[in-house]
């Protein structure tokens, strides 16, 4: 008979951070942890088909199994291409 595990689910915005602790059955998935956290109801901007997720900063799939003490993170979409931003900074530095 599987036991219980405690997992944190985190979602951070520039102005506010959400951190929900949930208790799940052993063998629960990342998606189950997110749904149990209630963040999908609190934040309608979270779309699990678009937002990437991770466990302690390591990319994860919604189907990955979570373990006791894990922190599941929901990442916001990038608003700018990092390569493009680096290119622009390099051009700006070269023009000085």
Swiss-Prot record:
InterPro entries per record: Mopterin_synth/thiamin_S_b, RnfH, RnfH_sf
SUPFAM superfamilies noted in UniProt: MoaD/ThiS (SSF54285)
Disulphide-bridged cysteine pairs: none
Top-level taxon: Bacteria
Residue spans crossing the bilayer: none
PANTHER family named in the record: UPF0125 PROTEIN RATB
Similarity remark: Belongs to the UPF0125 (RnfH) family.
Protein name: Protein RnfH
Gene that produces this protein: rnfH
């Amino acid at each position: 008979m599987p036991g219980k595990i405690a997992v944190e689910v985190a979602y951070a915005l520039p102005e506010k951070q959400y951190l929900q602790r949930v208790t799940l059955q052993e063998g629960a998935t990342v998606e189950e942890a997110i749904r149990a956290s209630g963040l999908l109801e609190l934040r309608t901007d979270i779309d699990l088909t678009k937002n990437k997720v991770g466990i302690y900063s390591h990319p994860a799939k919604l189907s990955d199994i979570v373990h006791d003490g894990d922190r599941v993170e929901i990442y916001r979409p990038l608003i700018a291409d990092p390569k493009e931003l680096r290119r622009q900074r390099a051009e700006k530095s070269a023009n000085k």
